[in-house]
């Protein structure tokens, strides 16, 4: 685990402990069951994909550790509607506060504004967070193999299935791709960002895609800015892309989304 992930995992465990002290497992399970029915995240990606076209997971992200503040004019419901109008298949909403200036309410309000499935983009270190994610309205969770072991990853994925959610399993290298396959992942994200240097290289997806589980839907993440990038990633066999910063920096998010997908 890199230093940055170790720091995030440490504060996230403290945060989860505090949240669990306020809401028992029974209480969070009840809230999850009371939430509106899950929207099929993976199914939406499959439905939007076509030859020469990657499905888009459009990200609502205010800031990041590497880039700082990304968008000052930040209104999650407005951005969600802009992405939907631009043709996005799904949304990704950052809820981590310390590193990304995210908030749980961003997910709640963004999902309420649209009909798109939403993934909660956060750092999961406890199965309790899966039920919490469903209670917030999330249709999918992110499982980052670089910061957890396979036992916890399997628990998170199992809990997601129990609640009718999809799990996007994120990998960064060959070893993690092998782990994703062993875990039976059917939705795998390849992050093109090096977690130590923060350097982004689309060649990561080109290198790892051939090792992806045969039946998994492959998502390429980070570093996609132009339609040429999309064409390059489509050639790897990826069916979807997760894009945040390049769209969030545009004044006209809808037009930028359409241009990227077209």
Swiss-Prot record:
The protein's annotated pathway: Amino-acid biosynthesis; L-tryptophan biosynthesis; L-tryptophan from chorismate: step 4/5
Keyword NAD attached: no
Keywords assigned: Amino-acid biosynthesis, Aromatic amino acid biosynthesis, Decarboxylase, Lyase, Tryptophan biosynthesis
Matching Pfam families: IGPS
Keyword Amino-acid biosynthesis found: yes
Catalytic activity annotation: 1-(2-carboxyphenylamino)-1-deoxy-D-ribulose 5-phosphate + H(+) = (1S,2R)-1-C-(indol-3-yl)glycerol 3-phosphate + CO2 + H2O
Biological-process GO terms, alphabetical: L-tryptophan biosynthetic process
EC number: 4.1.1.48
InterPro entries: Aldolase_TIM, Indole-3-glycerol_P_synth, Indole-3-glycerol_P_synth_dom, Indole-3-GlycerolPSynthase_CS, RibuloseP-bd_barrel
Superkingdom of the source species: Bacteria
MF annotations from Gene Ontology: indole-3-glycerol-phosphate synthase activity; phosphoribosylanthranilate isomerase activity
PROSITE patterns: IGPS
Family designation: Belongs to the TrpC family.
Stored PANTHER family: INDOLE-3-GLYCEROL-PHOSPHATE SYNTHASE (PTHR22854:SF2), TRYPTOPHAN BIOSYNTHESIS PROTEIN (PTHR22854)
Database matches in HAMAP family: IGPS_B
Protein name: Indole-3-glycerol phosphate synthase
Protein encoded by which gene: trpC
């Amino acid at each position: 685990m890199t230093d940055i992930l170790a720091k995030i995992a440490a504060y996230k465990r403290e945060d989860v402990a505090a949240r669990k002290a306020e809401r028992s497992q029974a209480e969070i399970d009840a809230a999850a069951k009371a939430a509106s029915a899950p929207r099929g995240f993976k199914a939406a990606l499959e439905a939007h994909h076509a030859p020469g076209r990657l499905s888009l997971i459009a990200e609502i992200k205010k800031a990041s550790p590497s880039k700082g503040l990304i968008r000052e004019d930040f209104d999650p419901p407005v951005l969600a509607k802009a992405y939907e109008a631009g043709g996005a298949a799904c949304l990704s909403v950052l809820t981590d506060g310390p590193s990304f200036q995210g908030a749980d309410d961003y997910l709640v309000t963004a999902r309420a504004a649209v009909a798109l499935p939403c993934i909660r983009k956060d750092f999961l270190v406890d199965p309790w967070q899966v039920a919490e994610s469903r209670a917030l309205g999330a249709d999918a969770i992110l499982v980052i193999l670089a910061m957890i072991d396979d036992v916890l990853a399997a628990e998170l994925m199992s809990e997601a299935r129990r609640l009718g959610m999809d799990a996007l399993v994120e990998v960064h290298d060959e070893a993690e791709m092998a782990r994703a396959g062993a875990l039976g992942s059917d939705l795998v994200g390849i992050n093109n960002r090096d977690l130590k240097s923060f350097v982004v290289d689309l060649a990561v997806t080109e290198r790892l895609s051939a090792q992806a589980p045969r039946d998994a839907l492959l998502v390429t993440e980070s570093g996609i800015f132009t339609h040429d990038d999309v064409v390059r990633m489509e050639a790897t066999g990826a069916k979807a892309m997760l894009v945040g910063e390049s769209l969030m920096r545009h004044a006209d998010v809808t037009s930028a989304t359409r241009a990227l997908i077209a």
